[in-house]
Amino acid sequence: MKTVLLFVVLVGLAYCDDDGWDMGNFFQQYHQWQQQISSSSSSSSSSSSGGGGSSGGGASGGGGGSSSGGGGASGGGGGGSSGGGGLTKVVLKAGGGGGGGFKSVGGGRGGVTKLVASGGASGGGSVSGGGGGSLALLAGGSAAGGGRSGVVTVSKQPIIINRQVTHVNTGGSGGGVGGGFGGGRGGFGYGLYGGYHHYNPCGYGQVYSYYYGCQSIYKQPARQVYHQPVYQPVQTVHQPVQYYQQPYQYQHSYGQPSYAYQPQTTKYISYSYPQYSSQGSYPTVAGGSAGGFVRGSSGGMGFSSGGIGGHSSYPLSVFKHAKGEKYKL
């Protein structure tokens, strides 16, 4: 305290002139001096410690951001400053190397964390979720190994509705758990055209149909005669069939024969329709020429029967396929 007072007196004497005290200039300089001291102290306390970002809550690199030994960055203290239920986008890049990519990024308190991770190694990006917050992940390596440890890979920009991933792609000839980022040889998440790209622009409770647009996943009312079912690439959709009885011939009293038709019978539509069972994740599409599976954001598990191009499927915990159900028109 004595040192500060002595400094103030010395500064005041320095600004003393023949005409008297120039108090306005003195206080202005003193205020600027305080700001400089506070800014220098804050900048020195927030410097990085390890080469991977801020040490308080961001990404704290183990061996540098682009080292080839142990991957790029691991989650810091608080989970990447998700802000408690907010939306945090973390973009981390690691150079090519052995372990490849990223260890873990902790989510916030129920917040949603977008992670765009591009590791350049064959091991892919191994990403694990944080404390309660669901993750939309764009992870994996550039080789056939693909992602590991249950990595859910998405193509391009993920769309998160109610903490659920609606934009999922597990393409790539590598197949395996979670597919891969580019698969064996291929481009940006498609591999040898093995991945199936599914995009759902509809709202909650609806599924996007390639032919008919947004369709409700609830059973359609009986009065909607011309409403088409949800298009499913895996299952066969049968078109409506109308049944008519054979015409019968009758004779008028004056001898002129005529033909008449009996009233047509009740029409039915028999097709495979997904019966909505629980409000879980949106349809997840699995691909890859080697099959494999991927987990949805709410725990639903989709599956693929493999083959070139793969097949699409819905999470088993969300939809129950009711084959052959008849809906009266």
Curated annotation (Swiss-Prot):
GO cellular component: extracellular region
Entry comment describing in which tissues the protein is expressed: Prismatic layer of shell (at protein level). Expressed primarily in the mantle with highest level in the mantle edge and lower level in the mantle pallium.
Biased composition (Low complexity): 38-48
Disordered, as annotated region: 38-80
Keywords: Secreted, Signal
Keyword Oxidoreductase belongs to the record: no
Localization per record: Secreted
High-level lineage: Eukaryota, Metazoa, Spiralia, Lophotrochozoa, Mollusca
Domain of life: Eukaryota
Biased composition (Gly residues): 49-80
Species this protein is from: Pinctada maxima (Silver-lipped pearl oyster)
Protein name: Serine, glycine and glutamine-rich protein
Signal sequence residues: 1-16
